[in-house]
Amino acid sequence: LYQDSTLLALNTVGGRESLVATTTARFHAWSQRRLRAWPHTMNCTATHDTKRGEDVRARLAVLSEMPDAWTTAVERWFSSLAGSNIPTPWLKEVDRATHLFLLQTIVGAWPEQADMDSYADRVAEYAVKVVREAKIRSSWLEPDERFERSLAAFVRFSLKGEGARHFQKCFAPVISSLRHHGLVNSLGQVLLKVTCPGVPDFYQGT
């Protein structure tokens, strides 16, 4: 859940790559089986174990429909870093997989009315949790504090430091698309939850 940075919309309990897409016919067949076998089961889109909010997952799912635009934005960002004044140790410390994980996190949860200082601090704290949960570069039992400090500093550089202008220039089109199409996904998600066989479950008002 914290090691694979391919598509974070799938990185949740019960998620798997085979669920990326399906056909209309297969979806209806699945719904009919569900109605026969478990007519009173819960239709959950969020639980206490969910790693991301429903709306963030709905936004990130859009990346699967715009891989070229996403790849272009990411490569532009990496190119801008190569020509920036970012301290070299930060670039050496932050591996590409962690970097991609955080980029998706940032654009998926991008706030409507951005208080970037607060947002940068929240993402920096979350970044430390991510690498500890991944247990590759750090962990809860044996934290690599130097790496974590570099990671948090890099996040703040990207969102409210010298890199912020470059970041928004690279990712503004992607964020705009995720916001618009993610809203459609969110509404569709709620519609399916309340109309498909089963009992809709709304976790903490979601």
Mark where each language-model region is.
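Catalytic cores of glycan-processing enzymes that make or break glycosidic bonds
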Residues: 1-206
